[in-house]
């Protein structure tokens, strides 16, 4: 884990406590498997009330950073074993050097998942799948509009395919999905490339040609891979802000 001695940026007491604890875990000040200091000592060190600290500890425990042991010290978890994808934004903020790899993993996961569930959606309900493109003609040519349309399209296909687990994954990745989407879609050529993909997928849905889904997705990923490679090589340092 990378050492990062940046000044804490949080404003509220709860956010300050959370940032302090998370950064301390990431920098191995509180290494995995160790116990946190007592609530009293930790609250005094951070400068927050014990009530605020307790709320923060409970939230971090839900995210997998900690294990609260009643009557015993709070234990620091190995996040790679205990946490879920909902902490990805936090990881990117903690270590920008790891951000390209994490984002590349996320894009790969989306591609592999979508090949499966979009195929199922078109196969089982081509009409509902086609309806997901109802707003395509009105799609405004801006990074913000493309990012939102793209997120909703891929997410709603999980609904049509009756894949609730995939839908939850999209929910947990929404923040980072939108941030990198804005980076990708700020370029006109990227929007044009993606618009062509949408039109191809729309036609596949209209025809109910589920067998064409995987090939269409893979061709689009191949066409856009060079663009993504360039983006990941020059990620802005303020991506998580």
Curated annotation (Swiss-Prot):
GO terms for molecular function: DNA binding; DNA-binding transcription factor activity; fatty-acyl-CoA binding. Residues 11-79 form the HTH gntR-type domain. Keywords: Activator, Cytoplasm, DNA-binding, Fatty acid metabolism, Lipid metabolism, Repressor, Transcription, Transcription regulation. InterPro entries: FA-response_TF_FadR, FadR_C, TF_FadR/GntR_C, Tscrpt_reg_HTH_GntR, WH-like_DNA-bd_sf, WH_DNA-bd_sf. Pfam families: FadR_C, GntR. It comes from the Bacteria. Residues 39-58 bind DNA. The keyword Repressor applies. GO terms for cellular component: cytoplasm. Multifunctional regulator of fatty acid metabolism. NCBIfam families: fadR_gamma (TIGR02812), PRK04984.1 (NF003444). Homodimer. This is Fatty acid metabolism regulator protein. The lineage of its organism: Bacteria, Pseudomonadati, Pseudomonadota, Gammaproteobacteria, Pasteurellales.
């Amino acid at each position: 884990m990378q050492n990062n001695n940046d000044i804490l940026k949080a404003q509220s007491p709860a956010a300050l406590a959370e940032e302090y604890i998370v950064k301390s875990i990431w920098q191995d000040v509180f290494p995995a498997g160790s116990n946190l200091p007592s609530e009293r000592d930790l609250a005094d060190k951070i400068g927050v009330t014990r009530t605020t600290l307790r709320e923060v500890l409970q939230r971090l425990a839900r995210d997998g950073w900690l294990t609260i042991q009643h009557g015993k010290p709070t234990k620091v978890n190995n996040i790679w074993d205990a946490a879920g994808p909902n902490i990805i934004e936090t990881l990117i903020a903690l270590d920008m050097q790891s951000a390209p790899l994490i984002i590349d993993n996320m894009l790969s996961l989306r591609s592999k998942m979508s090949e499966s569930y979009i195929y199922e959606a078109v196969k089982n309900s081509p009409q509902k799948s086609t309806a997901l493109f109802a707003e395509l003609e009105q799609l405004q040519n801006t990074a913000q509009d493309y990012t939102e349309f793209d997120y909703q399209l891929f997410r709603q296909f999980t609904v049509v395919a009756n894949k609730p687990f995939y839908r939850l994954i999209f929910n947990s990745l929404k923040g980072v999905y939108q941030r990198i989407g804005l980076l990708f879609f700020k370029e006109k050529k990227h929007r044009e490339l993606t618009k062509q993909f949408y039109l191809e997928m729309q036609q596949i849905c209209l025809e109910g040609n589920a067998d064409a889904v995987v090939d269409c997705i893979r061709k689009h990923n191949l066409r856009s891979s060079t663009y993504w490679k360039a983006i990941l090589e020059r990620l802005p340092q303020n991506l998580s802000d």
